[in-house]
Amino acid sequence: PVQRSEDIISTQFTKDTVEELGLLKMDFLGLRNLTVIEDTVKIAAEDGINIDINNIDYNEPKVYKMISEGDTDGVFQLESGGMRNFMKRLEPQNIEDITAGIALYRPGPMDFIPAYIKNKMSPENIVYKHPLLKDILEMTYGCIVYQEQVMQIVRTLAGFSMGRADEVRRAMSKKKAAEMQRARQSFIYGEDNEDGSVRFVGCIRNGIDEKTAESIFDDMDAFAQYAFNKSHAAAYSYVTYQTAYLKCMYPAQFMAALISSVMGNTNKVASYINNCAYNGINVLPPDINKSRADFSVVGNEIRFGLTTIKNVGENFVKALVAEREKNGEFKSLRDFVSRMITELNKRSVECLIKSGAFDSLDGTRAQKLAVYEEIIDSEYRAGKN
């Protein structure tokens, strides 16, 4: 059955029913951070800097140093105070560390963070419950972090098929007790077909003693209900690294794109401007003859975007920039009003004056505030005549 919702035809089946029918179910997520990455590359290109974001160095020490110091404003997934502290303790040295960090920093897996960090700092002290676990868990310092590791363990130690391993993963993640008990039995003792042939060999028939097998299954059971899909975490970690790389290697371009992406959020804009100051990037005030709609880069400095100013609309700014590019810079407040009279309103001009956007023109702010209404009225009258 289907239904129409806002001109879109959609199924009335639940996601579980869709999967049971063998149909493909996909989740599409929109990320503002992808726009920030794209805009950073475009801003850099304006200055003749070519950034091939698909071929950056994922082993740049400066990037990992920045992350380890907690300077992660604008870095995807790493902005929260808790995540900053985690990165400082973790001191990631490669993309795998970031991937694991993203997978661990959630309710449930957080309990495993101390053990993960301890093992990372002293890998020589890691003890595996069975030698076969080393190849599976060595990358995550002896800890089960991903769903894929659970599947790999039951396949390597107990001979499960890929399909059966995925069934175990689902049973663990959804806490299905009956299925879990069956999976435990099969994992430890194996499973035979009706004709007596071996379906899954099991740990004991694979030379692993019962006590060790029980303990390993308990570990999987404890973590699997929280375990993250590695492909999901890896996709996130690459976006994380790309944003961190751009911030580290092209800070002005990145921060300009970042601030432009949150121009409707005053608190975010202020926070990111403070981070610019922290990193030695000067943010120039708005200027009627220099500013664009968005934040832009001038040398190693950032110029304030006009659409960030309260009561200054996007369409008005587009018209302003177009007029400036066509007929040159504005020479005075009256020149500005005369050329923009069909687009402006008094509130917008007042806010531009108060923001300092006219400071480069003759006269003080107080003088401009005292006369701008009279200038606008006179230009309106002149236009009617």
Identify the function of each model-found stretch.
Residues 1-385:
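Noncatalytic, beta-rich nucleic-acid-contacting surfaces in large DNA/RNA-processing enzymes
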